[in-house]
């Protein structure tokens, strides 16, 4: 089964361009043109990755990302934010909102595919750990153990290290 990727952008030509590139790599693609629809799709579909435009009218990508990462049912889905904003403060804003990666437009195809594959690998490892251990993801953290009454949490960035131990 191929990975399911949600593309969220208010500009349909941008969606179509990404959709063509991703379906050529055999990914299953869903699309949304606004933040509200993106959240609805994320809540009702099994997704492996979200490509999310940062600047959209209404609910912007930063807010969509914040809401997704606050939802324990969605927090484990990696988000790559896409934007024409090049300033580092916008990248920081996206990362603070919970984005897992950031790609600046215009999008280089090689970088896009490499980052998509990297995030999907991390998602696969997270899914394997969750299925194997039965633990859950909460606010982008995986609780793997407890010391006394206190959970020991690891962010998704430490999972490859844990997995290789």
Regions from the language model: what does each represent?
Residues 155-161:
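Conserved small/polar residues in nucleotide/adenosyl-binding loops
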Residues 103-116, 120:
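C-terminal output helix
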Residues 11-30, 44:
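Two-component/phosphorelay signaling modules centered on CheY-like receiver
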Residues 45-51, 56:
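Active-site beta3 strand of CheY-like receiver
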Residues 15, 57-58, 75, 87, ...:
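The feature encodes the CheY-like receiver
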């Amino acid at each position: 089964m191929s990975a399911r990727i949600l593309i969220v952008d208010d500009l349909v030509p941008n969606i179509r361009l990404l959709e063509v590139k991703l379906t050529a790599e055999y990914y299953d693609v869903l699309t949304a043109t606004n933040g509200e629809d993106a959240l609805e799709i994320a809540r009702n579909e099994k997704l492996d990755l979200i490509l999310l435009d940062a600047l959209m009218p209404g609910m912007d990508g930063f807010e969509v990302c914040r809401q997704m990462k606050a939802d324990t049912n969605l927090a484990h889905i990696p988000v790559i934010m896409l934007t024409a904003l090049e300033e580092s403060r916008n990248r920081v804003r996206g990362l603070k909102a919970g984005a897992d990666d950031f790609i600046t437009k215009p999008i280089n195809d090689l970088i896009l595919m490499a980052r998509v594959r990297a995030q999907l690998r991390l998602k696969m490892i997270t899914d394997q750990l969750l299925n194997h251990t039965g633990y859950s993801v909460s606010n982008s953290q995986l609780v793997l153990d407890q010391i006394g009454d206190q959970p020991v949490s690891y962010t998704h960035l430490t999972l490859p290290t844990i997995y290789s131990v």
